[in-house]
Amino acid sequence: MSASLVRATVRAVSKRKLQPTRAALTLTPSAVNKIKQLLKDKPEHVGLKVGVRTRGCNGLSYSLEYTKTKGDSDEEVIQDGVRVFIEKKAQLTLLGTEMDYVEDKLSSEFVFNNPNIKGTCGCGESFHV
């Protein structure tokens, strides 16, 4: 089962052009480092679970949760010692996506650079494919 939500803003971004890849999800070094930092304080959890939820003005929004186990239908991505699980409902939506972690003076958030997104809302929190 999944546990509490990860305390970070999740933003969908479609402006960046990515090279096609067969990987369901790739992580930037910044995302890997942040996930390691988050999990360091949660030794009972094995990784993060990424999902999509129906919400927002554009239809879909990403969700991130700590997880203690891999679900039967989850796809597992292991990169640089970090485990990220993708819920079945999100697998096709995330195909070829790069997960990044960005910090500036005003905010810090995970950013999904997703080549499949056809549009986002003004704030970038929700999207459609």
Curated annotation (Swiss-Prot):
Main location: mitochondrion
InterPro entries with a match to the protein in the record: Fe-S_cluster_asmbl/transfer, FeS_biogenesis, FeS_cluster_insertion, FeS_cluster_insertion_CS, HesB-like_dom_sf
Transmembrane segments: none
GO biological process per UniProt: iron-sulfur cluster assembly
Superkingdom to which the source organism belongs: Eukaryota
Job description of the protein: Involved in the maturation of mitochondrial 4Fe-4S proteins functioning late in the iron-sulfur cluster assembly pathway. Probably involved in the binding of an intermediate of Fe/S cluster assembly.
Name of the featured protein: Iron-sulfur cluster assembly 1 homolog, mitochondrial
